[in-house]
From Swiss-Prot:
GO molecular function terms noted in the UniProt entry: rRNA binding; structural constituent of ribosome
Keyword Ion transport applies: no
Domain of life: Bacteria
Matches recorded under SUPFAM superfamilies: Ribosomal protein S19 (SSF54570)
Family, per entry: Belongs to the universal ribosomal protein uS19 family.
This protein's name: Small ribosomal subunit protein uS19
Annotated keywords: Ribonucleoprotein, Ribosomal protein, RNA-binding, rRNA-binding
InterPro entries given in the database record: Ribosomal_uS19 (IPR002222), Ribosomal_uS19_bac-type (IPR005732), Ribosomal_uS19_CS (IPR020934), Ribosomal_uS19_SF (IPR023575)
Species this chain originates from: Acidovorax ebreus (strain TPSY) (Diaphorobacter sp. (strain TPSY))
Lineage, opening ranks: Bacteria, Pseudomonadati, Pseudomonadota, Betaproteobacteria, Burkholderiales
A GO cellular component annotation in the UniProt record: cytoplasm
Gene for this chain: rpsS
GO BP terms in the entry: ribosomal small subunit assembly; translation
């Protein structure tokens, strides 16, 4: 179910403060955040945001096509290693 339009997008206030500070100081270091639930706003375009995936912070460069999506969509949490190979001896 989608979010109601009258509520507006959700962004953690501490993330907005960090982004505004990075824009004001023209800092190129990634903005580190644990807030995967925050929505990407147009102010984030051109910044690198380091999103936590449960193990490490994944750098995500924000483009205009990402606006409206959540930050967690761009930092995958699960790694698929592939199914194990069949270890049975093959007959010739």
């Amino acid at each position: 179910m989608t979010r109601s339009l009258k509520k507006g997008p959700f962004v953690d206030h501490h993330l907005v403060a960090k982004v505004e500070k990075a824009i004001a100081t023209k800092d190129k270091k990634p903005v580190k955040t644990w807030s995967r639930r925050s929505m990407v706003l147009p102010e984030f375009i051109g910044l690198t945001i380091a999103v936590h995936n449960g193990k490490q912070h994944v750098p995500v460069y924000v483009t205009d096509q990402m606006v409206g999506h959540k930050l967690g969509e761009f930092a995958l949490t699960r790694t698929f290693k592939g199914h194990p190979a069949d270890k049975k001896v093959q007959k010739k």
